[in-house]
């Protein structure tokens, strides 16, 4: 491995909508944008590769199965004030998947991007 950047690929239905979501609501910056096929956005050392149906990542597998958005894997963003983030994002119309879950390590909630990919917001217990 040659660098400290963490790259995560999300399959999305609409590249432009995904770029708008991640830059407007979650503080990502655009690295490149070539809709409808692809864009990548970054936040710190996290780089999201947003691949639309027209991208190489959206091509059918050898068995004919087509990759699609969604699922339960997700990026995990840490916040110092989960309640404030939830209120801000709700006011912006961002859809949430669940209510806050509290565990021994902290509190978490899941929100969805325009294609149904999950983003976990997490506040460690010591905050």
Predicted regions and their residues:
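Catalytic core of Fe(II)/2-oxoglutarate
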Residues: 11
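Conserved active-site tyrosine of GNAT-family acetyltransferases
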Residues: 18, 22-25, 89, 116
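Short glycine-/small-residue motifs
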Residues: 118-121
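Vicinal oxygen chelate
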Residues: 1-7, 29-78, 86-112, 123-127
